[in-house]
């Protein structure tokens, strides 16, 4: 009698956090490529573009324009900036990520955290 074995191959993605960290690293090391605007579609300009990209590894992330400064308000792009934004620092059931939101929103943009306390008066519809 004979025996059979079955082999199956598949690709599996790594953990989502690992993919995110990899992409974040690529983003921070991305190469800016300057292409001449209005250079046309001539053979010479196509050759220059091909030469520019041939010197860049296929594994590198490239961009044509700088990313906006997310710390600053930019109404055109709909970015609120970080100045004056509320952050969660204390409270029950907050994750580590949420507790560090003040540091991310303010600290990484060179701003200080301003703590404000407010007294709220409201009707509780109490019956005695």
UniProtKB/Swiss-Prot annotation:
Keywords: Developmental protein, Disulfide bond, Extracellular matrix, Glycoprotein, Lipoprotein, Secreted, Wnt signaling pathway
Cellular component per GO, a single term: extracellular space
Main location: secreted
Subcellular location: Secreted, Extracellular space, Extracellular matrix
Lipid moiety-binding residues (O-palmitoleoyl serine): 1
SMART domains according to UniProt: WNT1
Keyword Lipoprotein attributed: yes
GO biological process: animal organ development; canonical Wnt signaling pathway; cell fate commitment; neuron differentiation
Glycosylated residues (UniProt): 74, 93
Disulfide bonding pattern of the chain: 71-109, 87-102
Modification after translation: Palmitoleoylation is required for efficient binding to frizzled receptors. Depalmitoleoylation leads to Wnt signaling pathway inhibition. Proteolytic processing by tiki1 and tiki2 promotes oxidation and formation of large disulfide-bond oligomers, leading to inactivation of wnt8.
Name of protein: Protein Wnt-8
């Amino acid at each position: 009698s004979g025996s059979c074995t079955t082999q199956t191959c598949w690709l599996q993605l790594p953990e989502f956090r690992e993919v995110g960290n990899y992409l974040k690293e690529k983003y921070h090391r991305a190469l800016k490529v300057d292409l001449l605007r209005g250079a046309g579609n001539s053979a010479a300009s196509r050759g220059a573009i091909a030469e520019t990209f041939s010197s860049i590894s296929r594994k590198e992330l490239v961009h044509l324009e700088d990313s906006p400064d997310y710390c600053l308000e930019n109404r055109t792009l709909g970015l609120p900036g970080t100045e004056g934004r509320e952050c969660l620092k204390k409270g029950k059931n907050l994750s580590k990520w949420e507790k560090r939101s003040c540091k991310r929103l303010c600290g990484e943009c060179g701003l200080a955290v301003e703590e404000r306390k407010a007294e709220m008066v409201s009707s509780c519809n109490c019956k005695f």
